[in-house]
């Protein structure tokens, strides 16, 4: 009897996608604040449209931060250097509307900086999920890994000059054929590869397809997953000259599935970018990813989902949940007990154990581009 299989798809976006541009600006602001003041409380949002970028939100910090410079530097480093590519970093309008963190939140979460780390409460209510699978060395889903790496490859060959016709904006999508091995996911082959990338006016559609196959797809997707039936959609809409904020509006926090597991596992709905570690949308998601990855890496399960939940101002989590999808070597309740013994889910202690108060050198900015806790 033939093995029953199914298709699953994950997508990613390039650093020049308008939403991802906003994520990176918000995290560049966070980096700058934490670099000078590790106790900074940051909730920074960004939006963008043609010839305009706005940063807004609540920030309480001792850092001296030039928000406009951060915006322009980030846009320039991505490659937005003229209106022709979607945004001119040096001449676009930059709007800043930053206020202090609410005093009500400040006293409830960290007692206006008087609480010990173990007593710091969650910055808000919410539930976060961590996921891990043994199908790749990164303990990430293959569909998500390949989509993410294709996007990174597009950026690399654009910036190193291999494909000079490329521009910053773009999206990738990978469909993988899997079979379910008693709860574990086993990838068989890549069914479809989709790339839509911004380009200049000089390149032809045939040249785009040839370059993408040779310089982007071939180095990223292992040959064993490609066959004569693999489908390639390379700029299927035709031309894609107008991209970046000129093509679409962008907003922080609209690519949360791309930032996590590509549609696998689950998601609590909270975004990461522009948030300091007291915001459990970020730190809580990071620690449950570490827990799930540890479970799989240590052979307790082949696939695992971990959930944690919080109440605003309360240090201890309300709940911790483990689901091994039936792949556990021991019962899930025993895995849960091990997780609770091994991991401290209090927000202040997460910041210490994962070193989340250290900014600078593009640390959180890099998180905006690729999931760096792989």
UniProtKB/Swiss-Prot annotation:
InterPro entries hit by this protein: ADOMET_SYNTHASE_CS, S-AdoMet_synt_C, S-AdoMet_synt_central, S-AdoMet_synt_N, S-AdoMet_synthetase, S-AdoMet_synthetase_sfam
Reaction(s) the record says it catalyses: L-methionine + ATP + H2O = S-adenosyl-L-methionine + phosphate + diphosphate
Database matches in Pfam families: S-AdoMet_synt_C (PF02773), S-AdoMet_synt_M (PF02772), S-AdoMet_synt_N (PF00438)
Iron listed as a keyword: no
Enzyme class: transferase
The enzyme's E.C. designation: 2.5.1.6
Residues given in the record as K(+) binding sites: 45
Protein's recorded name: S-adenosylmethionine synthase 2
Provenance organism: Pisum sativum
